[in-house]
Amino acid sequence: MADKLALPLLLPCTPSSKPYSHDQNHHISRTPFLTTSLSSPPPPPVEPLLHDVFLHQNPNSRQPISSQTSRNRNRTRIGKSRDPNLGKPWSYHGLSPQGQQVLRSLIEPNFDSGQLDSVLSELFEPFKDKPESTSSELLAFLKGLGFHKKFDLALRAFDWFMKQKDYQSMLDNSVVAIIISMLGKEGRVSSAANMFNGLQEDGFSLDVYSYTSLISAFANSGRYREAVNVFKKMEEDGCKPTLITYNVILNVFGKMGTPWNKITSLVEKMKSDGIAPDAYTYNTLITCCKRGSLHQEAAQVFEEMKAAGFSYDKVTYNALLDVYGKSHRPKEAMKVLNEMVLNGFSPSIVTYNSLISAYARDGMLDEAMELKNQMAEKGTKPDVFTYTTLLSGFERAGKVESAMSIFEEMRNAGCKPNICTFNAFIKMYGNRGKFTEMMKIFDEINVCGLSPDIVTWNTLLAVFGQNGMDSEVSGVFKEMKRAGFVPERETFNTLISAYSRCGSFEQAMTVYRRMLDAGVTPDLSTYNTVLAALARGGMWEQSEKVLAEMEDGRCKPNELTYCSLLHAYANGKEIGLMHSLAEEVYSGVIEPRAVLLKTLVLVCSKCDLLPEAERAFSELKERGFSPDITTLNSMVSIYGRRQMVAKANGVLDYMKERGFTPSMATYNSLMYMHSRSADFGKSEEILREILAKGIKPDIISYNTVIYAYCRNTRMRDASRIFSEMRNSGIVPDVITYNTFIGSYAADSMFEEAIGVVRYMIKHGCRPNQNTYNSIVDGYCKLNRKDEAKLFVEDLRNLDPHAPKGEDLRLLERIVKKWP
């Protein structure tokens, strides 16, 4: 795809950055933190703090013997719920009486592991001339140790066995498979792979069970690409997969977000090998549809499953319901719930959580809360996923007080936060520019005995990226790799988005190329990420090419695809194309989902199209969707720019009634509105208000207040705000300086204006064309063209690094604009 975009790619090189730290100016306290208020009135303090909830949790975990650090992951093992022996007592089937006696002694707490070698020598001495009996005894013995969770002893027993003379003649694949499985459960997947490769190099013939065990071990530890590589090697070696192998690799494909056509091709190959899908296969295929929001494909598999003679179970219904939820179709998800109940299946916590997530994802938080209450009334207690989903939903909608209230309810219910909860708080603080608080939450993860997961790192990358902090993005990425995480598709997508938000589009495309080189296949989320990057640059023609590529069959577009196209048209000033796409949404050619209507409000506001913005806002509400904080901010912004104070206040009242917490964008829009009015002093009042709430103003906030005072010739007040801005750690930009220069020039204070130019150059800020235009135009407005020309002639003395031809441009401006 990068080739089709015809975009210049940088050579792979990571931008230089200091070793990543939370804050170079002060040390971050490791005292657990979740008490800072985000709004007014402040939410109740969150005491006890997160680590107190984890007081009895053991943070110690076994580390794998591998070059790659593993992460503990809570994953359902393939086939675990269908194990016919689940819950049954251990049977000594296949184990000799002496073996049973040895096993009983080994599982005793006081067994001296130093005696293991001699005990094993005595046990296997009678079998030394009977290879088949040795193998059977070893298999039963290892299974017994595994049943009693004595994995370490089992692995040591196997190591002892491998040191025996002619061990290969006594070893069979059943033993290899069970050892690989044990190593996988112990997090020692690399050791399992090394053993597997060593046996192959020694000439041992590995069968399908050994291959499948290694594939499962990689899959269960989240090392999906390595699982696929083992599957490919298995086929290359002429080893035929079984149904279980296919089911495991289909599950891996789903986790990787493999394109649907590749998944269906594998199923067809399975059938051509004479292997018929079972119920687990169909359930896995439905689950595979989640990543691409493939609700139609999931419904088709659902019908095929029935036609094949299989009965639906709770897993089937939950999987289909989840696909509808992730496809932004909560109504269809609710229909699945009703059908599930009619067929005699009681909704589980998984069912309710999927539905709550579906409603929260679409901003339908009242419905999500109603479901939570409904599940509690029916005896299903909300768990950490329920609360964290609601917390994230309220945060995303801009309702921070409601989010904190949910966290309080979670604590009071005795529900321990998990890593997802921490990730939600990291995102909440990061989205509001509270980076110190965000990093305290990050520190608290380890204090509470947890470890950051891939989502934690991706969230940090996204937060720093959307704030244009490219050196921090590079620093986090380095720390992430140092922690042992291998970038997967979501990380690459996040990096593409982060660098494009920082204005480093070439670097974003370099990341995309690296992703392809790493063997990661683009999916819907990747295409949408690239489209979003193109949209930021207004590159609408290339966006249309990407859309055409998707529609050609590689990947079915969704509502986020069209959202990016709207942004591309808006940023590229293609208002006609934007209107045409909007009409397709309103007419139903493209389904008018909530996120599309919200995007229409945003792009129309950005393009200052008031009637169109109001239409999109009305359509959103009339179709039963709830506006979020971004949508409401867009309406405040467009009303503020047009000095429609009553309308802007009406939106603010709506926000207050519905429990929305004003964001920095809200405050900046209000400051902008007042900065252009007779009541310009109100801009600083709002600045003081947000400071009092513990929110750090950004450069836009300070520039707006400076403009308010400069516009009204209150230069001392403007200078006071400038000093305050610098003291807060925010570096003035060219807009800041140009505001002063323009104001001084308009008041004939040219000496002061030129003094500001010297000051900005001295402090590392380069003047732009607007800087010098203001001074030249100021002279010309007063009919002082000669002085304007003298200023231009002396420009090189003032700014030795001014662009070549800048003086000629300014002289031409004097002639053409001021004849």
Swiss-Prot record:
Species assigned in the record: Arabidopsis thaliana
Residue ranges of the region described as Disordered: 57-93
PPR repeats: 172-206, 207-241, 242-277, 278-312, 313-347, 348-382, 383-417, 418-452, 453-487, 488-522, 523-557, 558-592, 593-627, 628-662, 663-697, 698-732, 733-767, 768-802
Cysteine pairs bridged by disulfides in the record: none
Xref: PROSITE patterns: PPR
Family: Belongs to the PPR family. P subfamily.
Keyword Ribonucleoprotein tagged: no
Top-level taxonomic group: Eukaryota
Protein name per the record: Pentatricopeptide repeat-containing protein At5g02860
Keyword terms: Repeat
